[in-house]
Amino acid sequence: MCGGCVQEEYPDRGSTCLETGSFLLNYVSCVQCNKRDFVLIVNKTAEEEDGEEIITYDHMCKNCHHVIAKHEYTFSVVDDYQEYTMLCMLCGRAEDSVSVLPDDPRQMAPLF
């Protein structure tokens, strides 16, 4: 992973968890070839462990094949919530939790 290729290492992305793609606004240029071109997604794997889906891949410079960052995305269902996480030097860090119920109990207003 290369901190010289990104504007900010592991930026806080709130609840934006990317299963695929790249956060190009954070990409400065490749530190090895000094070009700012497309970022390839390579070495993508998808595994499932104990009900948790884990997707990993590398962000790579199109021109010189320098590895810019390693991306990890996880998805799981815990109780009545879908849990998402993302950790990547380029795309950032994020967490999200979405209720599987029609009405999210956390969003309901108290009656009294």
From Swiss-Prot:
UniProt entry tagged with the keyword Signal: no
Organism superkingdom: Eukaryota
BP-aspect Gene Ontology terms: positive regulation of DNA-templated transcription
Ligand binding (Zn(2+) 3): 59, 71, 88, 91
Signal peptide feature range: none
Entry's Gene Ontology molecular function annotations: zinc ion binding
Keywords assigned by UniProt, alphabetized: Activator, Developmental protein, Metal-binding, Transcription, Transcription regulation, Zinc
Family from the record: Belongs to the Churchill family.
PANTHER family linked to this entry: PROTEIN CHURCHILL (PTHR31931:SF2)
Protein name per Swiss-Prot or TrEMBL: Protein Churchill
Organism encoding this protein: Xenopus tropicalis
Encoding gene (name): churc1
